[in-house]
């Protein structure tokens, strides 16, 4: 018998996460490693679990994630976005609570490019009057 799976793709900064929800007991596996091994910050792990806590499905599904690009924060945001989208496939009723928490909106903030003549995106070289 084929197992039921729900898919969602999440993006944040330069990270892309492909998320699979499988009925299980609440494990989160990122790139074949437990989430506590993969992401070293408890605050980011809580961020990732937010959609599951809001919909009260934390112990109902195993989350299998493939994520690439970006750093810890961007990847955590991408995983959170992907889980939220996958939960919509599970039950469209979750849309209102997830939308209210702002979990279905792709965060558009990106790193601003460095401009020539400047030291960073906006930081100008030191100005000397004389």
Curated annotation (Swiss-Prot):
Any single biological process term in GO: translation
MF annotations from Gene Ontology: RNA binding; structural constituent of ribosome
UniProt keyword Manganese present: no
Ribosomal protein keyword on record: yes
GO cellular component, one term: cytosolic small ribosomal subunit
Span list, region Disordered: 105-130
InterPro entries found in the cross-reference section: Ribosomal_Su5_D2-typ_SF (IPR020568), Ribosomal_uS9 (IPR000754), Ribosomal_uS9_bac/plastid (IPR023035), Ribosomal_uS9_CS (IPR020574), Ribsml_uS5_D2-typ_fold_subgr (IPR014721)
Transmembrane segments: none
Composition bias type Basic residues, residue spans: 111-130
Keywords recorded for this protein, A-Z: Ribonucleoprotein, Ribosomal protein
PROSITE patterns assigned to the protein according to its UniProt record, in alphabetical order: RIBOSOMAL_S9 (PS00360)
Coiled-coil stretches: none
Similarity comment: Belongs to the universal ribosomal protein uS9 family.
HAMAP family on file: Ribosomal_uS9_B (MF_00532_B)
Protein name: Small ribosomal subunit protein uS9
UniProt source species: Bacillus pumilus (strain SAFR-032)
């Amino acid at each position: 018998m084929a197992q039921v799976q729900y898919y969602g793709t999440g993006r944040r900064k330069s990270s892309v996460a492909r998320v699979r929800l499988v009925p299980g007991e609440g494990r989160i596996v990122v790139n074949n490693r437990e989430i506590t091994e993969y992401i070293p910050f408890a605050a980011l792990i809580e961020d990732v679990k937010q959609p599951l806590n809001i919909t009260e499905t934390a112990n109902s599904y195993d989350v299998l994630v493939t994520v690439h690009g970006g750093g810890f924060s961007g990847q955590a945001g991408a995983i959170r976005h992907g889980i939220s989208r996958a939960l919509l496939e599970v039950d469209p009723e979750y849309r209102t609570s997830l939308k209210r928490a702002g979990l279905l909106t792709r965060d558009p903030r990106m790193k601003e490019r460095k401009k020539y003549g400047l030291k960073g995106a906006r930081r100008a070289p030191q100005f000397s009057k004389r």
